[in-house]
Structure formats: structure tokens, C-alpha cells
């Protein structure tokens, strides 16, 4: 379901960004919001994992000993059984060949509809097609929160300004 929807990302989704999640420089995320409220969580283009020379070695949806996002079982129209996520809920941990580990957060309140199991067997999808087949998870905000879900997120234009400021501050030093 969501994978097929994610494929039409550029056409049917509105793109929003969250920069420096949890105060970590450049750890930026992107949410693709569909008009039906569904939000697809992806890495933003400036995320360290998407930079040249990075190789993803593992992706782990096991958040804690008692919580695995892979155990999320959703059924029915009301999405019964879906794990509820807060803005700071971790979705997965991704390790790279340089020894760095990145925690990917939901940053959207709502029900976890699905995680992308395809990236477990093919982590390169995350880097090659981050906005389509390389998405991380699909979250459905509560109906009453669906309009406010983008508060605090950046438009593509605002995100470009953030990237320009970073570039200018790094080239100025």
C-alpha cells in the first residue's frame, strides 16, 4: 500500500522537512504528506547517511529489548494494533561503515502504519531512492491533529535556506 503511494511522492505528496533533529547538526528528515493524512518518513537530502562515501551496514527496527517496530501489526479501517508514536519516538537505528550510528525518529505523532522491510535486505535503497523505495516508515496522524502535524516543519524553500546558511557558515570558517 504505502510503498506504491511512496512511488508517486513527487506528484501526490507535499514535502516537509525537520532540520537538526534533537539538536544533531545535519540530521535532517523529510516527511511526505499525502492529502489523505498519511505521512511517509524519509531521510532529507542533507542527512549524513546520504552523503558520498557513506555505506550503510545495518538497519535495526529493534528499538529496545521490548519494542520492535517490525512487530507492528495493523488491521482494519481504524488501524487497530498500530504502535502509537510521539514526535521523538525512535523508528530505527542505522549504522554506517565508518562506525557512526544514527537514530531515525518519527517526528510525527500518530499510528505507525508500516515500516519499510525492503531496506533491511537492500540498505542501498535508503541512499539511492530515499523519497521512494527507500522510505523508512509510514505514519498516520490522528484526524484531529492532521492539520497541525506540519507545525514546526520547514517548507522546501525554508529548508533550502537552512542548507545555504550551513554552506555559508562552513565555507566561512
From Swiss-Prot:
Gene Ontology terms describing biological process: dendrite morphogenesis; regulation of actin filament polymerization; regulation of filopodium assembly
Domain of life: Eukaryota
Entry keyword set: Actin-binding, Cell projection, Nucleus
Major place of residence: nucleus
Entry's localization field: Nucleus speckle; Cell projection, Lamellipodium; Nucleus; Cell projection, Growth cone
Cellular component terms per the entry's GO annotation: dendrite; filopodium tip; growth cone; lamellipodium; nuclear speck; nucleus
Stored Pfam families: GCV_H
InterPro entries documented for this protein: Abitram, GCV_H/Fam206, Single_hybrid_motif
GO molecular function, one term: actin filament binding
Functional summary from the UniProt entry: Actin-binding protein that regulates actin polymerization, filopodia dynamics and increases the branching of proximal dendrites of developing neurons.
Homology family: Belongs to the ABITRAM family.
PANTHER family: PROTEIN ABITRAM
Protein known as: Protein Abitram
Biological source species: Gallus gallus
